[in-house]
Amino acid sequence: RDPEMSRGLGDVYKRQLLANPKENAEHTMLVDLARNDLNRHCTDVKVDFLKDTQFYSHVIHLVSRVSGKVRPKTNPIQLLADTFPAGTLSGAPKVRALQLISEYEPHNRGAYGGCIGFIGLNGTLNQAITIRSFVSRNGELWFQAGGGIVAASDEEYELQEVNNKLGALRRAITLAESKKEVNA
């Protein structure tokens, strides 16, 4: 756990996050996007909880859960296709946001922002967004992080958020390298 969190700063950061108008507006937009995505194939779509805070080693997140009852005979692959990518990686309106991402980002995101999971033989679908993960390709290790940039964004705050997200990955590399040296 981050030393700042254990020194009691976690509560300060939590209050700052909950009071941040941009973060709250962004989160509300993402919850609405999730509701809209699920409404395509679900009934009884509801928000189970809204804007809970979850602490991770280097970041604090606002977390909500949106759920619904999948309509009978819904194809799980179509359900995945119609809800992918998650709004947290695209923004809204989703189609236009994806067009802008394709236009402005200098390269394809690859595995980042994709998903990993399974579709069971019984139609069960379970997947997770591939963020804060490593990709090993041709002897090189790749990792990345991002954030929601909007007109109201504060550049320094957004950069710090990305660096905080990358902090856990950098820490994992440091720990792996130190174990490698011990075992050498």
Provide a role label for each language-model segment.
Residues 1, 7-184:
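Extended alpha-helical targeting/anchoring segments
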